[in-house]
């Protein structure tokens, strides 16, 4: 009988994919389904992107690439960050990975080990807590407060930091609440983090372009005082 490592028992799953599978089964049975279980747009990949991807393959742009990703793509990402967030990022600091979960997994494994503490938003994306536990670190939830429109209290987060804290995970706009942290609270958090140089920050901003009611998205990239640990 196969024996898996103990840490595999600490790796949870994302139930949204179970909902997706059930919804697709019902759709095949002819049911009219509106699936709210997974973060996927209701439109297909735009045609010009499909055409360019197909053309690149036909032109021979495949095979192994540099580990961080091809330079033209990293330069394009840097240009997009400058355009949308007003920050300059050296393309040499950009790494292209196949999806957000891979980024989270790598970042958490870089800092997570027995005895370490990692702070993560709660309620939040379930993979945060799952991978923290997989790494052997202690998962410390930072509450997102309903009375603050599911934002956090910067002072409360800073009070949770100890000498064992290795990583602070932020997600704004947040999954699943949709809450966005206001600039004043992020200013306060960053000012406090200056006193905790041993703490790295993982800023999950995947929903930065899904913002309504004129709400401002504040990127952690715009704070040079923590750029070396972001």
Residues covered by each model-derived region:
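Conserved PLP-anchoring active-site segment centered on the Schiff-base-forming lysine
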Residues: 110-132
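Conserved active-site segment immediately N-terminal to the catalytic lysine
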Residues: 200, 216-230
